[in-house]
Amino acid sequence: MSFNHKTIEELHDLLVAKEISATELTQKTLEDIKSREEAVGSFITVSEEAALKQAAAIDAKGIDSDNLMSGIPLAVKDNISTKGILTTAASKMLYNYEPIFDATSVANAYAKDMIVIGKTNMDEFAMGGSTETSYFKKTKNAWDHTKVPGGSSGGSATAVASGQVRLSLGSDTGGSIRQPAAFNGVVGLKPTYGTVSRYGLIAFGSSLDQIGPFAPTVKENAQLLNVVASSDVKDATSAPVRIADYTSKIGRDIKGMKIALPKEYLGEGIDPEIKETVLAAAKQFEALGATVEEVSLPHSKYGVAVYYIIASSEASSNLQRFDGIRYGFRADDAKNLDEIYVNTRSQGFGDEVKRRIMLGTFSLSSGYYDAYFKKAGQVRTLIIEDFDKVFADYDLILGPTTPTVAFGLDTLNHDPVAMYLADLLTIPVNLAGLPGISIPAGFVDGLPVGLQLIGPKYTEETIYQAAAAFEAVTDYHKQQPIIFGGDK
């Protein structure tokens, strides 16, 4: 018997009643992972021995009835440090790297007696939108194995969507949680910048990166955010603002809520059927008592260009630490120190990572800094001001998560610009440091469509309130791919 169809609260009740043990739940989860892994390829590492050892220790001391997450398995994206468990960032450069410390988000999960079941596949160093740049494997969409799962947190999304695990963690720099959540029909939240500590996250774009949760439902997503969100002295960008319980508004009605629908989010490049799906969702919110009105975010069209200058520049700096000297891959054909650096980085990084390092180095170089990096920062401020103006009058922003449904494997990975444009609806949220969620909102050609809700900083509980209200009157989150046990 599999337990992957049970909610976290249902699993908790079974554990407290001793109808199952943490060890049995872990064993069943490992079976679910193994039986589906060949089809989807969600994991780089499955930490079977460590997980079973941890489960046995939890059983020995007993399940805490007041701790919802006690004994619950968790999958973790492979750029989030886990002590003693390989953490590769899906790169040859870190193919053998075992951290000697846990990321704060992982430590918080361990503190609640969650069980890290394994590390999920991703685009190399989180650079990509299809989980095709991984050094180890290509993850496949849970609904159609000829399609991409999205990225860069593709493995974390498919692990939940395919029924391998109930909960997972990803990271989001320009849409890397929300886009794969949309492509796989699950709930993915990018929290306000600073809500979840970045300590232990292998850095890509330090002013953009944020760890966040995946789950099948809105409430379970909020329950996982309750675990991992915390202030942290080890992260200088950690925010002091905290919500006591991110589930506190779930179940409340949304009568009187004002929701903005930016015309730019339904314009050029958006699939007409996705546009129809979003407009139908807007009508559903109106039926629930909210007001939905069209607004403008005029500078959002510059988001992709701004993002790839800023993110690549930050990556160029962050990835300087990978040199083959202290840890990770080292080229064995070097005769001197210069050759160690050059050969290791040339052989250890994949093409997309090298492309972004070069772009970032160029943008920061003498004579080009003002024209590119400085100007990108100025336009970023204009994008932030656009959001501020809208949020002066509205509670939330509504729109599609992605311009299309999941595209085919090996269709965009040789066209960087087309791949970059797939993030045009999610990138502005990262540039502004805002919270954003993707929830299931329908299907086009049998593939899931994601609906994005964006709020002002530190309004995750309001986002969850609106998302849960929509979820309560729709059944998209209940529909499952064949690999999970559904009929799609």
Swiss-Prot record:
<dbReference type="InterPro" id="IPR023631">
    <property type="entry name" value="Amidase_dom"/>
</dbReference>
<dbReference type="InterPro" id="IPR004412">
    <property type="entry name" value="GatA"/>
</dbReference>
<dbReference type="GO" id="GO:0006412">
    <property type="term" value="P:translation"/>
</dbReference>
<keyword id="KW-0648">Protein biosynthesis</keyword>
<protein>
    <recommendedName>
        <fullName>Glutamyl-tRNA(Gln) amidotransferase subunit A</fullName>
        <ecNumber>6.3.5.7</ecNumber>
    </recommendedName>
</protein>
<dbReference type="InterPro" id="IPR036928">
    <property type="entry name" value="AS_sf"/>
</dbReference>
<keyword id="KW-0436">Ligase</keyword>
<comment type="function">
    <text>Allows the formation of correctly charged Gln-tRNA(Gln) through the transamidation of misacylated Glu-tRNA(Gln) in organisms which lack glutaminyl-tRNA synthetase. The reaction takes place in the presence of glutamine and ATP through an activated gamma-phospho-Glu-tRNA(Gln).</text>
</comment>
<comment type="similarity">
    <text>Belongs to the amidase family. GatA subfamily.</text>
</comment>
<feature type="active site" description="Acyl-ester intermediate">
    <location>
        <position position="176"/>
    </location>
</feature>
<keyword id="KW-0547">Nucleotide-binding</keyword>
<dbReference type="Pfam" id="PF01425">
    <property type="entry name" value="Amidase"/>
</dbReference>
<feature type="active site" description="Charge relay system">
    <location>
        <position position="152"/>
    </location>
</feature>
<dbReference type="GO" id="GO:0030956">
    <property type="term" value="C:glutamyl-tRNA(Gln) amidotransferase complex"/>
</dbReference>
<dbReference type="InterPro" id="IPR000120">
    <property type="entry name" value="Amidase"/>
</dbReference>
<dbReference type="GO" id="GO:0005524">
    <property type="term" value="F:ATP binding"/>
</dbReference>
<feature type="active site" description="Charge relay system">
    <location>
        <position position="77"/>
    </location>
</feature>
<dbReference type="InterPro" id="IPR020556">
    <property type="entry name" value="Amidase_CS"/>
</dbReference>
<dbReference type="GO" id="GO:0050567">
    <property type="term" value="F:glutaminyl-tRNA synthase (glutamine-hydrolyzing) activity"/>
</dbReference>
<comment type="subunit">
    <text>Heterotrimer of A, B and C subunits.</text>
</comment>
<keyword id="KW-0067">ATP-binding</keyword>
